[in-house]
């Protein structure tokens, strides 16, 4: 059991050698003896720790649990060998703990039960009495956790507020959050074998978490690997939660206190039962609620600071969001942060509200004198180091803050109501935006329809103008097309006059081939010259030998003959080599000619292909031009039909205008005739009008006298009474009873003088105008003016034929 405890302290292969070197000498003398006796000793100590002789109780002055009167490690109950063994073990533990590079050894030691920790701590003779009693007390609490949690929960909370011993923190955290009996612990190894989609994101954030801590500092270290495994397993359990650095801060604290399986279980409990999962969701609705509650607390307890924050636009989320997300793990140093985390494991997020408000109370005077940037610097640099001496002052101030859970629930309801209203308003705004967009689209469509309906005459006129412009542009384009075609023909003629490019290429190839043959011939000539030189040398030597042949012996003569034959063979060889070279030369010429022909053939094929492509393109263009021509003909036919219709319409309009002009001319002629008649009548009226009026008055007076005379002779009972003189119109051939010479005279005088009285012709009797009869001479003169001055319409109303007038009395 001790060997497993020791080996757990050296999991990190990078630190294993250092720690081993430090403790190897001290452990070598006791290791064999420890293996034989440690199991018996530990069981004896555990039974002594769990004995009912020392019970938990509270005092009236303090709520802490009392310590027993006698330590279970008392020398009176342990043998000297046991005491020596325990002292040596504790000494080795202290050496391992003091080594900064073997931090993992503490975590390994926490894998054991609380009873073994109590036994190892109680045996230390160097610890103070108070620390020893604290260890024993926490050992009893751990062993009797179920009963203590049910019966004395307040005392446990008070002990947690005073601080959990370092060696008990792992087991106490598990007990506080009920993580020991989780079934998910058995699934941890299976989860590590699976692949998570968030692995890259986890790797990226791990390197940025606690970069100054030795346990997580080095890349791919044991700490980073443990952190990656736990976070990967949780990402497979809770796929909705997106991993963030704040999540890793809480997980780091767990991984530094306990093995990774237990850290995984504690982390799952934190996310499920301590509202951390709601804080880390993408929507962060729980964080908004915490910010609202904390801001209301500031407004209630620190109103001046709240007003200062509002005036500087210093929002609560700018400094307090990290407090709730990391439980002050990234704000304070690790010892202070773990003390706050102990209370968080016991009491939840309440400690965050208390500590945050206590910090603001203690720094209110400094914050009131700073602007927004200064306050940010103060929160980032000053506040984290205010409690380096110890967290007792901070925790004491935090529990002096008034925290009302009922009011916090009320604020939660208010926040929920506000958010619900905001969501409803947002939904209403979205609905209105959608309706507005639909209405805009409908307005646009209506405007389009309206514009299309308002084309009518303007649109037709515009189309006519565009048609005229299109005809003009078509004529211009046809002229330009003819000019371009002429230019193309000229360019083709000039191009045909130039030498063919194929001939140039062929000549260049032939030139290259000739140069190659010339170079080969020169090389062959040089070789032949060299051979001729060698043959000449051989020939000279042969002549020198044959000149003295008759003096030589027969053997030497035979040798000379053989040499002659050899020379003749060499000569024939040279001749054959010359012939071979000639054949090679001819062969090379043939190959060169073949290559030239193949190049010419390839170029001819390329030309044929290019010509075929041109033919295809020209055929396509021809089809397009034919289609354009047919379209142009169709348009021309339509235009001609329209022109004919327009011509017919113009002719009809011309005929109508001619008829209207003829009518107007006839009307003008009639008006001119009436004008002439009026002029003549006016001339007649102006001549001797005054004298005629006097004569007419005299005649009227005579006629009235005659009428009066006739009244006594005849009865005019059948006639209507006369108010004056009535002039009755009679057509020619009418019969009247009474005609006298005076009436005939008046009638004839009226016809001859054409008096200017306005005689209104009616179907009944016509009367003279009384204004002319009773008026003065000046008024008569004014009334008898010409028809153009008095009544311009009078000449038009007078009939062109004269009628006879007679007066009946």
UniProtKB/Swiss-Prot annotation:
The keyword Repeat does not apply. It is found in: Nucleus; Cytoplasm, Cytoskeleton, Microtubule organizing center, Centrosome; Cytoplasm, Cytoskeleton, Spindle. It comes from the Eukaryota. Residues 49-80, 99-123, 760-809 are annotated as: Disordered. Residues 377-809 are annotated as: Targeting to the centrosomes. It holds the Pfam family RabGAP-TBC. Residues 1-483 are annotated as: Interaction with alpha-tubulin, gamma-tubulin, BIRC5 and FBXO5. GO terms for cellular component: centrosome; cytoplasm; nucleus; spindle. Residues 799-809 have a biased composition (Polar residues). The modification Phosphoserine is found at residues 102, 113, 497, 689, 776, 778. Dimeric and monomeric. Interacts with alpha- and gamma-tubulin. Interacts with FBXO5. Interacts with the chromosome passenger complex (CPC) which is at least composed of AURKB/aurora-B, BIRC5/survivin, CDCA8/borealin and INCENP. This is Ecotropic viral integration site 5 protein. It comes from Mus musculus (Mouse). The gene is Evi5.
């Amino acid at each position: 059991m001790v060997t497993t405890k020791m080996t757990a302290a050296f999991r990190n292969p990078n630190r294993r050698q250092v720690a081993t070197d430090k403790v190897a000498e001290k452990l070598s003398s006791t290791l064999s003896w420890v293996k034989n006796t440690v199991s018996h000793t530990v069981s004896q100590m555990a039974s002594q720790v769990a004995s009912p002789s020392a019970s938990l109780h509270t005092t009236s002055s303090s709520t802490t649990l009392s310590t027993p009167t006698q330590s279970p490690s008392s020398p009176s109950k342990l043998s000297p060998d046991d005491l020596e063994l325990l002292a040596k073990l504790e000494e080795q533990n202290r050496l391992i703990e003091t080594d900064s590079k073997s931090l993992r050894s503490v975590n390994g030691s926490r894998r054991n039960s609380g009873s073994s920790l109590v036994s190892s701590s109680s045996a230390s003779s160097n610890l103070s009495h108070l620390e020893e009693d604290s260890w024993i007390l926490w050992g009893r609490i751990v062993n009797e956790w179920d009963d203590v949690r049910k019966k004395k929960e307040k005392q446990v909370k008070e002990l947690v507020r005073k601080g959990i011993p370092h060696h008990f923190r792992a087991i106490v955290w598990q007990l506080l959050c009920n993580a020991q009996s989780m079934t998910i612990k058995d699934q941890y190894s299976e989860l590590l074998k699976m692949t998570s989609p968030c692995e890259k994101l986890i790797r990226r954030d791990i390197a940025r978490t606690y970069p100054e801590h030795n346990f997580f500092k080095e890349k791919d270290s044991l700490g980073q690997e443990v952190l990656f495994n736990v976070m990967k397993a949780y990402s497979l359990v809770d796929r909705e939660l997106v991993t963030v650095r704040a999540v890793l801060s809480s997980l780091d604290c767990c991984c530094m206190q306990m093995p990774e399986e237990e850290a995984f279980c504690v982390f799952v409990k934190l996310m499920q039962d301590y509202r951390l999962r709601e804080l880390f969701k993408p929507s962060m609705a729980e964080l908004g609620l915490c910010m609202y509650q904390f801001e209301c607390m500031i407004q209630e307890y620190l109103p001046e600071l709240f007003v200062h924050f509002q005036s500087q636009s210093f929002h609560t989320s700018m400094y307090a969001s990290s407090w709730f997300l990391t439980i002050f793990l990234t704000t304070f140093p690790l010892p202070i942060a773990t003390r706050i985390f102990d209370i968080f494991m016991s009491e939840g997020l309440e400690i965050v509200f208390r500590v945050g408000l206590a910090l603001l109370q203690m720094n209110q005077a400094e914050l009131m004198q700073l602007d927004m940037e200064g306050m940010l610097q103060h929160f980032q640099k000053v506040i984290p180091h205010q409690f380096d001496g110890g967290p007792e002052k901070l925790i004491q101030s935090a529990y002096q803050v008034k925290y009302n859970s009922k009011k916090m629930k009320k604020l939660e309801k208010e926040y929920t109501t506000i958010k619900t209203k905001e969501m409803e308003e947002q939904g209403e705004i979205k609905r209105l935006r959608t309706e507005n967009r639909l209405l805009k689209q409908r307005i646009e469509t209506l405007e389009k329809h309206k514009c299309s309906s308002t084309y009518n005459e303007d649109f037709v006129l515009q189309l006519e103008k565009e048609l005229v412009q299109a005809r003009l542009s078509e004529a211009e384009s046809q002229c330009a097309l003819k000019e371009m075609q002429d230019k193309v023909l000229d360019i083709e003629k000039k191009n045909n006059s130039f030498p063919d490019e194929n001939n140039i290429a062929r000549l260049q190839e032939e030139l290259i081939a000739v140069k190659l043959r010339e170079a080969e011939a020169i090389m062959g000539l040089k070789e032949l010259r060299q051979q001729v030189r060698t043959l000449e040398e051989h020939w000279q030597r042969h002549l020198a030998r044959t000149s003295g042949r008759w003096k030589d012996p027969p053997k030497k003569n035979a040798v000379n003959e053989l040499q002659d034959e050899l020379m003749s063979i060499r000569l024939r060889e040279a001749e054959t080599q010359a012939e071979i070279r000639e054949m090679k030369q001819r062969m090379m010429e043939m190959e060169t000619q073949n290559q030239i022909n193949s190049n010419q053939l390839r170029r001819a094929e390329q030309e044929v292909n290019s010509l075929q492509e041109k033919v295809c393109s020209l055929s396509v263009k021809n089809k397009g031009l034919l289609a354009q021509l047919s379209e142009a003909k169709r348009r021309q036919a339509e235009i001609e039909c329209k022109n004919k219709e327009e011509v017919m319409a113009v002719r009809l309009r011309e005929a109508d205008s001619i008829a209207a002009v003829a009518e107007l001319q006839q009307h003008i002629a009639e008006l001119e005739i009436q004008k002439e008649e009026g002029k003549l009548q006016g001339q007649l009226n102006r001549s001797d009008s005054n004298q005629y009026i006097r004569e007419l008055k005299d005649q009227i007076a005579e006629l009235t006298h005659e009428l009066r005379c006739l009244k006594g002779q005849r009865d005019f009972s059948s006639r209507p009474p006369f108010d004056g003189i009535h002039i009755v119109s009679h057509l020619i051939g009418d019969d009247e009873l009474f005609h006298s010479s005076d009436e005939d005279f008046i009638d004839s005088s009226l016809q001859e003088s054409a008096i200017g009285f306005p005689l209104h012709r009616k179907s009944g009797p016509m009367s003279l105008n009384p204004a002319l009869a009773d008026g003065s001479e000046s008024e008569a003169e004014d009334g008898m003016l010409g028809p153009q001055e008095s009544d311009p319409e009078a000449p038009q109303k007078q009939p062109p034929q004269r009628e006879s007038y007679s007066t009946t009395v």
